[in-house]
Amino acid sequence: MMWYVGVVNGENTSMKGGKMSIRLEVWGENALFSRSEFKTERVTYDVMTPSAARGILEAIFWHPGMRWRIDRIHVLNPIRFDSIRRNEVGRVIDIGKIRTMAEGRGDGGAIYTAESIQQRSSTILRDVRYVIDAHFELNRAKMSSTDSAEKFQSMFM
């Protein structure tokens, strides 16, 4: 999965109601925003979730002295679904075995895919494009004396 990020019409920042706002366009070939009520099969929400939008913004710029708040998510492309099947490993390596291997003892608990492979179905979104409107709030207790909203805004850009 590949995501692309860009500013919208050159208007990617503004000051509204005393808070710094940004507008960011994101798009990609496929997307999956997992619904937690489906246990084994992965099924996507119809649109990007606010927590996914916040994750994208935090991947671009994160600081302990600020918190991203999502104001609005615009859906630009029609909502379309695809179903895919994937082979996945049905178990994970035990952390104790990894420690043993790190200490030079044992094999680390290798997983042999022929023994634990599982085929899983996923319902994903296809050809997605969103515009995220967001702002950030400051936590002065976690900021240095040189930090400011303007500084964070310029670093995001």
Named regions from a protein language model:
Residues M1-M2, M15:
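Methionine residue identity
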Residues W3-Y4, E11:
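Short, positively charged and aromatic/hydrophobic N-terminal segments
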Residues K16-T40:
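N-terminal, Lys/Arg- and Ser/Thr-rich interaction peptides
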Residues G18, R67, I124-V128:
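A short, structural micro-pattern
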Residues F38, V43-E88:
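Glycine/small-residue-rich interface belts in oligomeric ring/scaffold proteins
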